[in-house]
Amino acid sequence: MSVDSLYIHIPFCHARCTYCDFDTKAACGSQLLSRGDAYVQKLLRRVRDAARAGVLERVETVYIGGGTPTVLGERLVDIVREIRSYCNPVEFTCEANPESFTPELAFALSHAGVTRVSLGVQSLDDDELALLGRIHSSSQAERAVGLARSCGFSTSVDLICGLPGQTMASWEKTLDRACALETDHVSVYPLMVEDGTPLSRAIEAGRVAEPDEDLQAEMMDVARSLLTGRGLERYEVASYARAGKECRHNIAYWTGKSYLGLGRSAASMFSSNDYGACAELFDVLDDPSGASRIRMVQLDDEGTAFDVETLSSREALAEDLMLGARMSRGISYDLLRRAAAVIPPSRLLETLKEAVDLGLLGLSDSWDSLEAALSCDVSRSGPCAMPTRQGWLMGNQLYGMLWDLHEDARSS
């Protein structure tokens, strides 16, 4: 058994951002060198264990995230080379921050086998970057994207909207500058204020204004209009790409493929059969029978402690419906038929009709065609229900409706 995707987590940054609640440690100089080296040694042992178990043989995508992977310098290159010695993924992404993405490191990562770089730009306004606690400037970010492109990487840029003090004009300027860099991919996220972060404390103390959710929604819609007008098509609620440049790794997450996560706070997801084939890597779940899907998060550096969650068939299919509604391709007829095998078809149709009536989903065919396909009277393929513009903007409502299908709360 081999998983479809591999995620590697690097829990180090040169400095923590004001909004960040990720499992990362701020470290520099000799402290980063010693802590980072010890972490990488443990991580590589886990990679080798996975390779010996045959789990990496057919990996199609690899993603190294953080934290800030590029703070590791040459040790990051060692990780890439080690992984490449066990598999030949079609997409190999590494996250990078502009201030630590040097020409020397970019060249080494390219030669080691990284194919795609995702840059944590967040904003191209220096005042907004300072508020977020970012330690790079807008000009550094622009140079980093240019460097990545010159090394032959497929490039992605992360941006955040709805920042305190951010105006529609400054947001549009950031989007314009990002497009001018000719990046292949842009991810756009509304700012989330997490409890316990410096940003949260500043808002509570009245030093910073709380994000306006209505303005965030407007900014997300402006991003849609501007990015699609510049050749970047929306393929997921927060993701835009040029043709053929979609993030395959994230699509694997959204389509229920199995993935292995290695490193502190890395998440894995398996079917019960997949888990049985690689249980020696975890040794934490005695009997996964009855579980359709198993999700686990590594809690330590060594890979000896995990938080485990199991999903029933009904929960797994409700989750797949929810994830399908995040993507422009929407919910397929095949997924709908599989869902109808464990969720009462009348309940399923009731929820879809409610979403359509609310303007959150659009159907590719008539209701009669949909009902016939569900009853298996007609064999159909392709998408059957796709998110509308309203569905994108009111995603939380749509996703909640579909996830609620995992419960038996209403009779069919």
Predicted features by range, described:
Residues 356-378:
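A short, conserved structural fragment
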